[in-house]
From Swiss-Prot:
Originating species: Arabidopsis thaliana (Mouse-ear cress)
Origin superkingdom: Eukaryota
Keywords: Cell membrane, Cytoplasm, Cytoskeleton, Developmental protein, Endocytosis, Endosome, Glycoprotein, Golgi apparatus, Membrane, Protein transport, Transmembrane, Transmembrane helix, Transport
Residues bearing attached sugar chains per UniProt: 163, 194, 403
Protein name per the record: Choline transporter protein 1
Membrane topology qualifier: Multi-pass membrane protein
Family note: Belongs to the CTL (choline transporter-like) family.
Phenotypic consequence of gene deletion: Impaired plasmodesmata (PD) mediated cell-to-cell communication. Altered choline metabolite profile. Several phenotypic abnormalities (e.g. dwarf with defects in both shoot and root architecture), including reduced pore density and altered pore structure in the sieve areas, associated with defective symplastic transport through phloem. Increased number of sieve elements (SE)-like cells instead of two companion cells (CCs) and two SEs. Defects in procambium maintenance and phloem patterning. Abnormal retaining of desmotubules in the symplastic space in sieve pores.
Pfam families assigned to the protein according to its UniProt record, in alphabetical order: Choline_transpo
Keyword presence, Cell membrane: yes
Length: 700
């Protein structure tokens, strides 16, 4: 049998085998897993270097606004041209847009001539409106004067310029089709103005194609996966106040309230949590139905500002919202049925939570402590999100390769129609940028797991002090045990925490990569049809999920033993696993039911955050003008995820209290031949009743 745990309490030997010390968990420790601490520090240095690349090369405006024919980002100031006011991208030549929509067309929409405007032009009922190129050369107009003239200086053109304009080669182009602001690009409406078209034909202009293709070509470009991804990332940047309030302050407030309620109304909290969880889940589902357009008239729309109510444009974002609405419906049904199934076990969870509530009452600093990792995570997320926006927009603006004969346009500086280097510009992403983005995402997950693990270890050390002092005088508990536990963690065990969080992050990353490969093969139709390969495919997915869940569970218990014993991560994992296996009959259902209630509590906080996120995003600020989000989907999911992380930090007070007391109970029983000397009476009663149930179920 394994000997006594090192340095659990004064009467045990310390981890290095030295003589016992006086007091509770006062022991001589050694620095553990130093190699992984060095790796973690190197990782942080790499994160800073990686982020500095993004800050140096990126421009988040690229995620929202398009490029003009010179490669300038609309809505920003450039060396030779100030486009700060001009945020809308407009395609000057409707025939180029039409040709880009043809299956056998040589011209791509990215090479069609575009400029940046203040608003989308509209055709006139009694005359022909023009939109002219940026004033240059002989056109002696300032940009502000050009804007005030509604981009029209046709009257100043020479006969040569007018002739090239009638050939749709500029510098002025007719406004034949109405257009609407769709995600900061003027999308043509394939309904030509009869009056404008008649004036154009009377002036001798070339034939202009009228077809739905002119509408679909732009729409296809706006709904491409790359464009949708850019808009989703841009939504995070636009909704940063929502993330601060609903992803930070709201879950912080709700988590503290939940802990206080657990402290004073523990008997009612499991019931309140289950009922509230189902109500919130249904409420969030209803909001998704509203945004999907299945309830009311508030569906997600890509159109910005006022527009013709009879004109509708549907983006890919609406499809995504509807998909999530269906998923939430399924989850709600499963959640309600599961809640009904666990009603009989809620009383057992109440008993376990009462033990945790007593710990919180005795060590009151535990309620306040999670605010420290919360503040550190908040600072990290602010830096991380800002860096992510710059990394996602850090591609190089390069000119496309195209057939120059299709993009000829009048050059005001050269005073002639120019077909050289008239292709459009695109943002080119190199492979190293993709690697940098994935490294940044992995870094976020590892850092989050590290902060959560550190918080859990500190809480475990504090609760262990409480447990082992029950058989002795209360002065034996060190003053402010939370800070004593923090000191031990910072001095000896940061490497062990870094290793545990790295293992979880690595397994989760592998699962993510395999899932991405699965989706890609599914789309391309390369998934094998043979039943054996399909079975192997789904079995591997299930195994990875099981491995992930097991590792997270083992890690949590390892952090407890790290806090108690000061041993390395692997040794602590082995000790914790041995203790649990030896006492599985006594602690089996108790721990599971307690975890279920706490998990539902975290979901309550995160769903509240998502609900508040929906309400904030439904305000005028995020439905119109510059801050309009393409869809509430990603900001709401971000609020949900941040709310869950904040709740995890605070709920770890209860979660780790239960787990630490149970593991301490197991060790206490082992050290005292099956009779725990320091266990609270309520815990003994709960565990003994659970053991009787397990024995009865095995014998019948």
């Amino acid at each position: 049998m394994r000997g006594p745990l090192g340095a659990v309490i004064g009467r045990y030997t310390s981890s290095d085998g030295s003589a016992p010390n006086d007091g509770i968990i006062k022991h001589n420790r050694k620095c553990r897993d130093i190699t992984f601490l060095i790796i973690f520090i190197a990782f942080w240095v790499s994160m800073i270097v990686n982020s500095s690349f993004g800050f140096n090369q990126g421009n988040p405006l690229r995620l929202t606004y398009g490029l003009d024919y010179e490669g300038n980002v609309c809505g920003s100031k450039h060396r030779h041209r100030d486009l700060t006011q001009l945020e809308l991208r407009y395609w000057l030549n409707p025939n180029q847009v039409y040709e880009s929509g043809l299956k056998d067309g040589e011209l791509k929409l990215a090479n069609a001539r575009t400029i940046c405007l203040l608003d989308c032009p509209a055709p006139s009922d009694d005359t022909l409106n023009w939109v002219c190129d940026y004033p240059d050369g002989e056109i002696r107009l300032k940009m502000n004067d050009w804007i005030d003239r509604n981009y029209d200086y046709f009257e100043f053109l020479t006969p040569e310029m007018r002739n090239s304009s009638l050939q749709l080669q500029g510098p002025c182009y007719p406004v034949i089709f109405p257009s609407v602001n769709v995600y900061w690009s003027c999308q043509y409406i394939a309904r030509a103005s009869n009056s404008s078209l008649r004036h154009w034909q009377q002036m001798g202009g070339v034939n202009i194609q009228e077809d739905m293709i002119i509408d679909k070509s732009i729409r296809r470009s706006m709904n491409s996966r790359a464009s949708v991804l850019k808009r989703y990332v841009a939504d995070i940047g636009k909704s940063w106040p929502v993330l601060i309030v609903c992803g930070g302050l709201v879950p912080l407030f709700l988590s503290i309230i939940w802990l206080l309620l657990i402290r004073h109304f523990v008997a009612a909290m499991p019931w309140i949590t289950v009922v509230l969880f189902n109500m919130l889940l249904i409420s969030v589902t209803v909001f998704y139905y509203l945004k999907a357009g299945w309830i009311g008239n508030d569906a997600v729309t890509p159109i910005i500002g006022e527009h013709d109510p009879y004109f509708h444009v549907y983006g890919r974002e609406l499809t995504h919202v509807r998909g999530v609405a269906i998923l939430m419906t399924f989850i709600s049904v499963v959640a309600i049925l599961t809640s009904i199934a666990i009603i009989r076990r809620i009383l057992m969870a109440t008993s376990v939570l009462k033990v945790a509530a007593k710990v919180i009452g005795e060590v009151q600093a535990l309620i306040i402590f999670p605010a420290i990792p919360f503040a550190m995570l908040a600072i990290f997320y602010m830096f991380w999100i800002s860096a992510a926006l710059h990394l996602f927009s850090s591609g190089q603006v390069v000119q496309n390769n195209c057939n120059n004969t299709n993009c000829c346009a009048y050059d005001l500086v050269l005073k002639k129609v120019n077909c050289d280097r008239c292709c459009g510009y695109s943002i080119h992403y190199t492979p190293h940028i993709t690697i940098a983005i994935f490294f940044h995402l992995f870094g976020c997950y590892w850092a989050t797991q590290f902060f959560i693990a550190s918080s859990a270890t500190v809480i475990a050390g504090s609760v262990a002090s409480y447990y082992w002092a029950q058989g002795e005088a209360s002065p034996e508990i060190p003053f402010l045990p939370v800070f004593a536990s923090m000191k031990r963690l910072a001095r000896y065990n940061l490497g062990s925490v870094a290793l545990g969080s790295l293992i979880v992050s690595f397994v989760e990353s592998v699962r993510f990569i395999l899932e991405a490969i699965r989706r890609k093969t599914k789309v391309s139709g390369t998934i094998p049809d043979h039943w054996f390969w399909r079975m192997a495919h789904y079995t591997s997915r299930g195994c990875l999920k099981s491995v992930e869940w097991t590792i997270k569970s083992v890690n949590r218990n390892a952090y407890i033993m790290i806090a108690i014993t000061g041993k390395s991560f692997c040794k602590s994992s082995a000790i914790a696993t041995e203790l649990i296996i030896s006492n599985i009959l006594r602690i089996g259902k108790v721990n599971v039911i307690g975890d279920v209630i706490l998990f539902l509590g975290k979901l309550c906080v995160s769903l509240f955050s998502a609900l508040f996120g929906f309400l904030m995003l439904d305000s005028h600020r995020y439905r119109a003008s510059h801050n309009k989000v393409s869809s509430p989907l990603l900001p709401v999911l971000a609020c949900w995820a941040l709310g869950y992380i904040v709740a995890t930090l605070f709920f770890a007070v209860v979660e780790m209290s239960i787990d630490t007391i149970i593991l301490s109970f197991c060790q206490d029983s082992e050290e005292n031949q099956g009779n725990a000397q320091h266990a609270p009476p309520l815990l003994l009663e709960t565990l003994d009743s659970n053991q009787e149930e397990e024995v009865q179920s095995l014998t019948h």
